[in-house]
Swiss-Prot record:
It is found in: Cytoplasm, Nucleoid. Belongs to the RdgC family. The keyword Cytoplasm applies. GO terms for biological process: DNA recombination; regulation of DNA recombination. The keyword Oxidoreductase does not apply. Keywords: Cytoplasm, DNA recombination. The lineage of its organism: Bacteria, Pseudomonadati, Pseudomonadota, Gammaproteobacteria, Enterobacterales. One of its GO terms (cellular component) is bacterial nucleoid. This is Recombination-associated protein RdgC. It comes from the Bacteria.
Amino acid sequence: MLWFKNLMVYRLSRDVSLRAEEMEKQLASMAFTPCGSQDMAKMGWVAPMGSHSDALTHVANGQIVICARKEEKILPSPVIKQALEAKIAKLEAEQARKLKKTEKDSLKDEVLHSLLPRAFSRFSQTMMWIDTVNGLIMVDCASAKKAEDTLALLRKSLGSLPVVPLTLENPIELTLTEWVRSGSAAQGFQLLDEAELKSLLEDGGVIRAKKQDLTSEEITNHIEAGKVVTKLALDWQQRVQFVMCDDGSLKRLKFCDELRDQNEDIDREDFAQRFDADFILMTGELAALIQNLIEGLGGEAQR
């Protein structure tokens, strides 16, 4: 099981029926296929269990995991520039004149298409967890754009997907700042030794503290000077550590060894059983963590 490393959290904005059997067929219509000779990028669904299963969905206890794969052709700018300049020089020599800008622009497209079949590919995979019990969707990535791209693929596959980023009643940075100022987080959470503080002024500074006592006078002085905490490393019940960000995302999730070893009694050769057990364990822990976090940060904004 690929334990999630990051969480971008989204709320289903209205009740929708997300049944795995139906979803399996819908995702199959947009299953991943590699780039053709003239494709810059392709994105589609693959089995979350990799070569161990053909199923595009994996379901347990009302939780669904799916996986998107993206292939991107890599064409470094210097390579394009060099090929374009050579082509322009050749044509200008043959025609004994300088090419116009419009001619050069169309040549760039030609060069791009001629290079594409020989370009290397970069592959990436993004896991998505759909919590049908709590009406949430979590994407395992660190960037909002990547999460939105994956959600867009799901929306296209399903026909519609009414989701919005999870929004809290109070600004997250103000709550995090208060936790650091008081030296105490919400119940179940503990401050660790890492934070980022930003000035509210447009051209103000950014302070990144690592391996530092966040209750120290130095940090307090930054807060008193008007900086707010935009990232804060936290521990939840000595089970999961993570960095809480002011955009509502959780980065660098780290599950304690005791938790990760809980399914060690399952034979590693039985990949499907281990994957299923780890998925149930991870989603159970993270669902509880998210609920605690929403409450600790002052509750979800009214919709």
